[in-house]
């Protein structure tokens, strides 16, 4: 949605007689369609090559799928809220998820990676990372991020001004 705003073509979408939630949903589905296959396949293959069985492969694929959907929902929201959202998204992944979240427990509470890693470790009966979250909490947070980001995306899209 960010590119449609920047190049001023979103006005054409607005005047199409469809429900306002459909455009953000289509953006989320489009980004998930592009992102999920390589993420899930590569994580599944890595689990198969380095893992110890079917449980690890299934848990890895399920966790990668949940995390990818959460990231797609969050980054679709960034596309509506910010200009140059790709740079902000890369900054979030590289700086926040890669460096800051690993440095402290408070910052880790705002990291999708920490919740997905915690869920994966619980599903495989491995030592959970620090800080640890229960499997239920990790599932709820990943689902909550996905749902909240999508809901905010729909609300923001409804309130955008036609330019």
Question: Across the structure, where does each feature detected by a protein language model lie?
Answer:
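Short cytosolic juxtamembrane segments of multi-pass membrane proteins
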Residues: 158-163
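Transmembrane helix boundary and interhelical loop/hinge segments in multi-pass membrane proteins
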Residues: 1-14
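Alpha-helix N-cap/start motif
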Residues: 20-21
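Terminal transmembrane helical anchor/hairpin motif
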Residues: 81, 86-156
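Secretory targeting signals
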Residues: 2-3, 24-92, 101, 128-141
């Amino acid at each position: 949605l960010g590119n449609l705003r920047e190049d001023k073509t979103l006005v054409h979408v607005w005047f199409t007689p469809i429900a306002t939630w459909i455009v953000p949903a289509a953006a989320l589905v489009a980004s998930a369609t592009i992102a999920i296959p390589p993420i899930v396949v590569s994580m599944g293959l890595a689990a198969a090559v380095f893992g110890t069985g079917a449980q690890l492969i299934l848990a890895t694929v399920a966790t990668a799928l949940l995390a990818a959907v959460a990231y797609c929902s969050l980054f679709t929201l960034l596309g509506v809220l910010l200009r140059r959202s790709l740079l902000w998204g890369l900054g979030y992944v590289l700086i926040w998820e890669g460096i800051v979240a690993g440095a402290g427990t408070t910052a880790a509470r705002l990291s999708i990676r920490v919740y997905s890693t915690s869920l994966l470790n619980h599903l495989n009966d491995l030592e959970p990372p620090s800080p640890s979250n229960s499997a239920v909490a990790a599932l709820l947070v990943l689902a909550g991020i996905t749902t909240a980001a999508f809901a905010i995306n729909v609300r923001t899209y409804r309130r955008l001004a036609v330019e």
